[in-house]
């Protein structure tokens, strides 16, 4: 799968794990994989910024279970939403990732020295813990923020829709409360899944922050994916 993805997007084959894991693992696995590839020296900052712009996706389980069954009462609806979501991510990549890659001798980070099993296992465990802590922290902060803003949002037309732009899960839970047709609700759900909400976006940014990736492509990618 690595070489077809590389040819399609003009990215190095080493970027393929971020795309595949991002599409299957859910938020923010794509960003975590990009950070790991940067740490290993497998990607340049330019390639990492390009793939990071479209590899942060909802998982099939999230779309089918939480959105399909939980919100719309239909696993089939969730599966269709995931298919649209995944296809939109891949199409977004054609916009934000294609183009000539700058050739720079110093473009890649220095590869980390090979580690023994014990060291690698400890490092992977610590990284997983940091990722889980980052996800939990941003979910907590934005859930509290949304609770504080709830009275003001409900005073606005379609304020419940704005909730999803802040914290995705809470916004999706309230979709069926909106006075919209089912078609409009599904369209809005698809947009929110692609955009991810600010909580998801900040999770991804936090994981790649040590590498100072340019943010323009990421912002454009989330808007286009939505």
Q: Language-model features: where?
A:
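Transmembrane helical segments that form the transport core of multi-pass membrane transport proteins
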Residues: 1, 121, 125-193, 197
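N-terminal alpha-helical transmembrane segments of multi-pass membrane transport
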Residues: 1-15, 134, 138, 225
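Juxtamembrane and boundary regions of transmembrane helices in multi-pass small-molecule transporters
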Residues: 8, 39, 72-111, 206-226
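Alpha-helical membrane segments and immediately flanking helix-loop junctions
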Residues: 9-72, 162-177, 185-211, 220
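Alpha-helical transmembrane segments of multi-pass membrane proteins
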Residues: 17, 126, 130, 134, ...
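Alpha-helical transmembrane segments in multi-pass membrane proteins
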Residues: 22, 80, 84-92, 138, ...
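Alpha-helical membrane-inserting segments
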Residues: 91-99, 141, 145, 149, ...
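Short, membrane-interfacial amphipathic segments enriched in basic
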Residues: 107-122
